[in-house]
């Protein structure tokens, strides 16, 4: 019984490692990204999360950046006339991936995320709640951007 489990686990591990080399070659493009953002706290948080996620793809040639990712992060708060109403925070991001040599836009897209903040009486608590909601939205957007950039890099296109 133990032999069967060991055999099955080796078989599964070998099947899953067949495609890793080609993916690693394509994903090396992620080490060649330069990120530009607007100078808000949330956009800097998104930039740092993306840089930390792609630090493993840095190679000897990654000092020379081939691609520029331009991030434009905007947020808005919707509320009603009532002071203690539920507030909706919407954060949207527009991004472009540009090849530096030819200045060609390779990808241009946008998406948004929403968060609700409950009714709070204290002004300080309301501000803290909005700050925390913005941080959560920033982390959510950065995770989504990481996935989108990995999908872009793994797409089989010669650039």
Where are the model-predicted features located?
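C-terminal or internal capping secondary-structure element at the end of a domain, subdomain, or sheet
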Residues: 134-158
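A structural "domain/chain start" motif
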Residues: 2-59, 63, 150, 154-159
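Surface-exposed short loop/turn segments
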Residues: 51-53, 57-110, 114-132, 139, ...
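Hydrophobic transmembrane alpha-helix bundles
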Residues: 1, 17-21, 46, 97-109, ...
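Charge-dense, low-complexity intrinsically disordered segments
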Residues: 37-40, 44, 128, 132, ...
């Amino acid at each position: 019984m133990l032999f069967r489990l060991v055999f099955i686990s080796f078989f599964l591990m070998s099947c899953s490692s067949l495609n890793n080399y080609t993916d690693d070659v394509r994903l090396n493009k992620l080490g060649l990204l330069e990120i530009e953002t607007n100078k808000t706290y949330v956009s800097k948080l998104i930039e740092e999360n993306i840089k930390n996620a792609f630090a493993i793809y840095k190679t000897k040639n990654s000092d020379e950046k081939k691609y520029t990712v331009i991030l434009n992060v905007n947020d808005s708060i919707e509320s009603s006339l009532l002071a203690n109403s539920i507030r909706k925070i919407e954060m949207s991001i527009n991004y472009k991936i540009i090849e530096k040599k030819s200045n060609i836009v390779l990808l241009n897209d946008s998406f948004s995320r929403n968060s609700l903040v409950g009714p709070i009486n204290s002004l300080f608590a309301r501000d803290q709640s909005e700050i925390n909601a913005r941080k959560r939205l920033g982390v959510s957007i950065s995770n989504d951007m990481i996935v989108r950039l990995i999908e872009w890099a793994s797409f089989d296109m010669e650039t």
